[in-house]
Amino acid sequence: MLKRRRTARTVALLVVLASVVVLALPTVKRIVRDLTLPLAYTSLIRQQARIEHLDPALIAAVIFAETKFDARTSPTGALGLMQIEPATAEFLAHRSGGVAFEVSDLAEPGINIRYGAYYLRYLLDQYGGNETLALAAYNGGQTNVADWLAQAHAARVRFTIAAIRFPQTRAYVARVERAQHSYASEYPRLVSGFTTSSSG
């Protein structure tokens, strides 16, 4: 009799524990997702994606690769969520119709995301919509991409991630591409109403 009561209590306890796990699982998954794949400024990202005809998951992925949504200044002087260098930001400000530009503007998320999205669109346009080339230029610079393209052309091979000579830039492009897919699948409301291509 005592053994049956213990068994019944054990079964009841296991049922309660299983119920708690089942009920808590979505919350735990969401917490893990938010820690490993953070997302903030969704409305700003979506707004700039719409203006620049970009995949919002691409913008989020660049922010993730650059700062994981924790804006800071890099050792090279790049600033803000999308790590834009002041000289690049000044070029972008003038090109996009800005009249006054201050380096401190880059600390403001709305301005930083606007310039970063504008720069991504500019690079995509420069490289015929090729995201690999645009991301390589975003991280490694357009001069280096021109050199890598020339080397691939001289060798009569198609340009791929493997042709990127800087290991950091090669890893960056791969990280952004992975994160872009993750943002699209983990945050469906981020990309809702958008096509998945940023080619223009």
Regions found by a protein language model. Give the residues of each.
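Hydrophobic membrane-insertion alpha-helices, especially the h-region
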Residues: 9-26
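N-terminal Lys/Arg-rich, disordered targeting/topogenic segments
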Residues: 1-6
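Catalytic glycan-binding domains that act on GlcNAc-containing polysaccharides
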Residues: 24-200
